[in-house]
């Protein structure tokens, strides 16, 4: 490999063409010191200068292989400080010689030294002994753009982590870390903060039901506040209740499961008894003046506020009955008695108060005398021996309520120190001429309990809870049977349902249910059970069918409706045959007859298809009931029959659509 040499530049030689100031003395063809990625340093020849991007291309020969790289201007000037200024260059210590095959004789006698390579010769990178200048600048290698971007992302990540740590620290200062449920509390608060009540309020349209179902949430009591219990109930609108149930994953991570329930009315913990009464029992008061049977009952867990809602505020064990639903109903009853419309009826008001405890009925106004519930010849339920006292004002009604509550059975439970253990029924009866005119039953149900909550209780307490749950279950079954139009309604399953029978099946009966719930997280299971119970009660709608059924009937209901329609059509046809009309039938009458005939044919097709389907199912069951039946043959035969049935049903569907379209057109013309 040819050597290279350095010649001193004399003043007589023409100076080199000056470069731009920021490039210094860097020119194409000079030798510069470079640093490799493995920290080796050697000489290389400058072959190209890019002034726009401020980088320099250098080349060298290493092991008979020509190599090159691009180096930015800053790195070149750091490794070669003598090239930084063209006007006053600093003296440079001689670099270590390049390999003998590439470097010739050098002379450093003059101040200014310019290294000029021989023509078509390139510096060698085989030698590793290249000394750094005697007074070097800071040997700082510029980082690649990729590395710079990585460092930038890392700095942003560290900044975000610092901010998150600061946020966690601030949150830790805001909450009481001694509360074990502060994480759940923050989840609930965050959920409520981002809750859009405008979207939730229209989750389910309000429908008219035979039972008005309302839910009332009570505030946290002193015991729950002392135990740092959380409020997991949210009432975002006037008919929606949300339960934030705390769950735990397999990795012990806690999360919320939010369950939503829709009712006729929902009241939060700030609602007063007057507000609850305005939307629950007050609309039913006037019905008893029209010979109606009204019922309002409170249902819920022990200690959820049933007696508070029905009876009034508590001050210790003393209760202010003037603010309960009992008193509010009595006030409206006596106000309506003075109305000119009902004043002519000469009505008298009576009050009764009895309890149902352990499957037996006791009169609370007659020192808890045991009573019998019997059915008379008119299939009306009568409580034999029940004392009825005439009342003339609200004060007398409150005296009866106070007397009855003083005799009512109560026990201490794990939730409440003074808990009612019986179903209390207070009735306001209107009589005209000694006969029943109307009745309003106000029922304060005993609190439902789970068996798991009474494991440490006495046997008597457990029997009490079992009897209470039995009667509440019977009440729900009766409501469901009425909602599904079952032929039998189990009213005789408990004394409670026997007493309330006329409130459900009477001609002018109207009922309202107030479900009271506890907001604490420890009562979450009981709260969900109460809401599910109330949700099932809501299914008893105005027409006797559950509201969640489809708009169009199916199955046997569809065939029954079609049969009735066909029967009416046939009767009308027979009637028209016997009536002799002297004139010719009009076009409208002719169209009506054609519509009836089409409906009759459709009914016959449907009946034939249904009979064929039932016969086919019986044949399949007989074949498959044998031991040696052919499975493949049965499957093939079933598929062929199904195809035929599908074709018939499709044809019936087309005819029904055409008939419906004709009826719509006819109604528009009329």
Curated annotation (Swiss-Prot):
The keyword Cell division applies. Its main location: cytoplasm. CDD domains: KISc_KIF2_like. The modification Phosphothreonine is found at residue 122. ATP binds at residues 300-307. GO terms for biological process: cell division; metaphase chromosome alignment; microtubule depolymerization; microtubule-based movement; regulation of chromosome segregation. Phosphorylation at Thr-122 by PLK1 is required for activity in the correction of kinetochore-microtubules attachment errors, while phosphorylation at Ser-201 also by PLK1 is required for the kinetochore localization and activity in prometaphase. It is found in: Cytoplasm, Cytoskeleton, Microtubule organizing center, Centrosome; Cytoplasm, Cytoskeleton, Spindle; Chromosome, Centromere, Kinetochore. The modification Phosphoserine is found at residue 201. Disulfide bonds: none annotated. Plus end-directed microtubule-dependent motor required for spindle assembly and chromosome movement during mitosis. Has microtubule depolymerization activity. Plays a role in chromosome congression. This is Kinesin-like protein KIF2B. It comes from Macaca fascicularis (Crab-eating macaque).
């Amino acid at each position: 490999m040819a050597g290279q040499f350095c010649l001193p530049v004399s003043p007589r030689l023409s100076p080199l063409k000056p470069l731009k100031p920021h490039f210094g003395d860097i020119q194409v063809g000079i030798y510069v010191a470079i640093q490799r990625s493995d920290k080796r340093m050697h000489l290389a020849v400058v072959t190209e200068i890019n002034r726009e991007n401020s980088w320099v291309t250098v080349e060298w020969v290493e092991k008979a292989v020509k190599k090159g790289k691009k180096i930015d201007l800053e790195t070149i000037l750091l490794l070669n400080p003598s090239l930084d200024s063209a006007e006053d260059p600093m003296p440079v210590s001689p670099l270590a010689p390049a390999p003998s095959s590439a470097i010739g004789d050098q002379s450093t006698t003059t101040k200014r030294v310019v290294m000029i390579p021989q023509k078509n010769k390139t510096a060698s990178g085989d030698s590793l002994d290249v000394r750094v200048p005697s007074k070097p600048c800071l040997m700082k290698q510029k980082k690649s753009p990729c590395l710079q971007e990585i460092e930038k992302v890392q700095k942003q990540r560290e900044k975000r982590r610092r901010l998150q740590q600061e946020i966690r620290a601030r949150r830790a200062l805001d909450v009481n870390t001694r509360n074990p449920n502060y994480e759940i509390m923050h989840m609930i608060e965050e959920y409520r903060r981002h809750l859009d009540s405008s979207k939730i309020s229209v989750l389910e349209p309000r429908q008219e039901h035979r039972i008005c179902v309302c839910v009332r949430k009570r505030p946290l009591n002193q015991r729950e506040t002392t135990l740092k219990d959380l409020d997991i109930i949210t009432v975002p609108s006037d008919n929606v209740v949300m339960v934030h149930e705390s769950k735990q994953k397999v990795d012990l991570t806690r999360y919320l499961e939010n369950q939503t329930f829709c009712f006729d009315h929902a009241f939060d913990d700030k609602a007063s008894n007057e507000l609850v009464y305005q939307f629950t029992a007050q609309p039913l008061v006037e019905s008893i003046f029209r010979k109606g049977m009204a019922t309002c009952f409170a249902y819920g867990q022990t200690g959820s506020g049933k007696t508070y809602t029905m009876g009034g505020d508590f001050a210790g064990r003393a209760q202010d009955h003037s603010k309960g639903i009992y008193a509010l109903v009595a006030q409206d009853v006596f106000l309506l008695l003075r109305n000119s419309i009902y004043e002519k009826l000469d009505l008298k008001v009576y009050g009764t108060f009895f309890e149902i405890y352990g499957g037996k009925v006791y009169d609370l106004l007659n020192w808890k005398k045991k009573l019998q519930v019997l059915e008379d010849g008119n299939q009306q339920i009568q409580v034999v021996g029940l004392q009825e006292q005439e009342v003339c004002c609200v004060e007398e009604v409150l005296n009866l309520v106070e007397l009855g509550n003083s005799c009512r059975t109560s026990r201490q439970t794990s939730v409440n120190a003074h808990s009612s253990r019986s179903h209390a029924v207070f009735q306001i009866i209107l009589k005209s001429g000694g006969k029943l005119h109307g009745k309003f039953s106000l029922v304060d149900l005993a609190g439902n309990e789970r068996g798991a909550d009474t494991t440490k209780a006495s046997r008597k307490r457990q029997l009490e809870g079992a009897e209470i749950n039995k009667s509440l279950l019977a009440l729900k079954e009766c409501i469901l049977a009425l909602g599904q139009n079952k032929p039998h309604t189990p009213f005789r399953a408990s004394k409670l349902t026997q007493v309330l029978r006329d409130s459900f099946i009477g001609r002018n009966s109207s009922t309202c249910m107030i479900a009271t719930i506890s907001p604490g997280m420890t009562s979450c299971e009981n709260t969900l059970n109460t809401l599910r119970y109330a949700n099932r009660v809501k299914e008893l709608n105005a027409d006797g069918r559950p509201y969640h059924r489809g708009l169009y009937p199916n199955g046997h209901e569809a065939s029954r409706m079609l049969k009735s329609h066909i029967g009416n059509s046939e009767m009308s046809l027979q009637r028209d045959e016997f009536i002799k009309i002297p004139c010719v039938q009009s076009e409208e009458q002719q169209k009506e007859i054609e519509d009836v005939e089409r409906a009759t044919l459709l009914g016959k097709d449907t009946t034939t298809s249904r009979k064929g389907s039932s016969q086919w199912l019986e044949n399949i069951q007989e074949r498959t009931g044998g031991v040696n039946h052919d499975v493949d043959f049965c499957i093939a035969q079933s598929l062929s029959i199904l195809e035929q049935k599908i074709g018939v049903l499709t044809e019936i569907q087309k005819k029904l659509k055409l008939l419906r379209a004709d009826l719509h057109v006819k109604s528009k013309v009329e």
